[in-house]
């Protein structure tokens, strides 16, 4: 838990405020801040740099001269990257610079960055009523009273942005005004001083303070989550299409499923309970057995002539045996 001073519009110290946020462990704090900074700075890139290749440059469809016989180097197009006004090799192309980060990690990095600036944090009382009419000179003098020198930068965090405060601050280049819902890691770490109003601090403590309930996602978090979900849906779904095709084939193969065993048993029981059905089954079984017996008899008759040798061969065999005996 850390404490910071509370100052009024005249620059007088009127009290102190405590700030206790759930932050990352010391051994991982620098890495989580690095990830959040890299994500924020990368997502800020537009990625509009784009060059044309030799296929996109206008012209160059005709071969400048014939392949052989001129004594000159071979050339197939006047828009070759080697030629003047030709295409560009490996130039920048339009692309999306998007890095995703879990919502809880983003919130942890934000709390860690804010808690790390406690020594440079100044709580000021709400001064919206003092800007009537809004004057840049009044805010510049108040910054000096609060301890922000002319060569130092500051981040002013308010609960809700008002037209009076914006008009009074927008012409001071070294001061950046943001609402509590616009809090980000880069702005917290990129200034010399962090100024926050008392109303913004109370909302911040109610949202992220120790003992507070789990923070609900802000509108920016919801928009980013929706963008990430849309990006995931836009990615190629070849694997999903292959799986769906396999599922369709399996569904077609199983279009005519076999009857369950319970249903088959039930059908057999119904057939046995009907005498006519039972007699028909017995007759079919007897006919099948008769056909099987007849087929076996026919096969036996066909095999008998093949097993007996011819009569002439029997006589020759007998004569040969008698000669051997003599």
Curated annotation (Swiss-Prot):
One term of GO molecular function: rRNA binding
GO biological process terms on file: translation
Name of the protein in its database record: Large ribosomal subunit protein uL4
Gene that specifies this protein: rplD
Keyword RNA-binding attributed: yes
Subunit structure: Part of the 50S ribosomal subunit.
Residue span of region Unknown: 212-326
Function summary: One of the primary rRNA binding proteins, this protein initially binds near the 5'-end of the 23S rRNA. It is important during the early stages of 50S assembly. It makes multiple contacts with different domains of the 23S rRNA in the assembled 50S subunit and ribosome.
């Amino acid at each position: 838990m850390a404490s910071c001073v509370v100052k009024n519009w005249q620059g007088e110290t009127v009290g102190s405020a405590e700030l206790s946020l759930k932050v990352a462990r010391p051994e991982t704090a620098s890495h989580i801040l690095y990830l959040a900074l890299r994500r924020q700075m990368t997502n800020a890139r537009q990625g509009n740099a784009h060059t044309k290749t030799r296929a996109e440059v206008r012209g160059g469809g005709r071969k400048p001269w014939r392949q052989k016989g001129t004594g000159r180097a071979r050339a197939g197009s006047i828009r070759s990257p080697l030629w003047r006004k030709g295409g560009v090799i490996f130039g920048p192309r339009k692309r999306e610079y998007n890095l995703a980060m879990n919502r809880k990690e983003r919130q942890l990095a934000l709390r860690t960055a804010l808690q790390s600036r406690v020594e440079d944090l100044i709580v000021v009382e709400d001064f919206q009523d003092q800007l009537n009419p809004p004057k840049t000179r009044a805010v510049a003098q108040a910054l000096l009273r609060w301890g922000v020198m002319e060569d130092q930068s500051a981040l002013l965090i308010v609960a809700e942005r008002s037209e009076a405060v914006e008009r009074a601050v927008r012409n001071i280049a070294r001061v950046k005004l943001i609402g509590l819902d616009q809090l980000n890691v880069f702005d917290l770490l990129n200034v010399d001083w962090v100024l926050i109003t008392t109303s913004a601090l109370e909302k911040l403590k109610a949202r992220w303070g120790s003992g507070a309930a789990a923070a609900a996602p802000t509108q920016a978090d919801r928009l980013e989550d929706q963008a990430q979900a849309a990006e995931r849906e836009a990615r190629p779904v070849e694997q999903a299409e292959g799986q769906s095709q396999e599922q369709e084939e399996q569904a077609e193969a199983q279009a005519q499923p076999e009857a369950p065993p319970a249903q088959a048993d039930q059908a057999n029981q119904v057939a046995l309970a009907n005498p006519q059905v039972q007699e028909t089954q017995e007759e079919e079984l007897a006919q099948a057995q008769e056909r099987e017996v007849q087929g076996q008899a026919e096969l036996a008759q066909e095999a008998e002539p093949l097993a007996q040798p011819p009569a002439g061969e029997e006589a020759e065999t007998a004569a040969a045996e008698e000669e051997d005996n003599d």
